[in-house]
Amino acid sequence: DTGGLNIKTGTGMSLMKKDMGGAANCIGLAKLVSDVGIQIDLHLLLCLVENSISKKSMRPSDIVKSREGSFVEIGDTDAEGRLILADAITYASESKPDLIVDMATLTGASRVAMGIEVPSFFCNDDDLAMKLIDSSKRTGDPLWQLPLWDNYSNQLNSEHADFKNIGNSVFGGAITAALFLQKFAKNTPWIHIDLMAWTRANKYSSYEGGEAMGIRALLDFFKRF
């Protein structure tokens, strides 16, 4: 992820090899479910994209049509992950699932709020959210709920399309990203996890690299779903 035409700095790009962490965690979760033998019908969708620069690059203010049919104005080309997630959520919804879970290294705003060790999550069903919080506590696998605060949704307003792919404020970026995705989940029960998927050396370990985050809590949650 270079950021596209809204290009990142060199420092901002330096760790982007870990930007596939959401997909990696989903693969890890699917393997856990298979190894444990939980009897659920699990469909794994991997949203894979390279965000780079070419003569075909998407431009700020371009308007694209989503799979769901709505038109999205590109406010920032570095907010590409939510575009492919939106189409995947729409695709998943077409089979009328009982639940959709997405995991993504989506926003720096979540890292600012939570640090790198605690993923944030959003959910459109309060009962499911409480069960996931309980599973997080039971497994010691941290997840922290942030609100789908509807009063921020007007930050996504567009004069030229149905909405933009990014909010017009420097504040609450993790929330507005989740509100964008919620437009595609609609009434399907849905959990969105915004994670770092990477750890740095700390007082407990000298290891630095990819990190499984939230999948133990989700495994426990699936057992009781």
Residue ranges and their predicted role:
Residues T2-F225:
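A generic structural signal for tightly packed, nonpolar segments enriched in small/aliphatic residues
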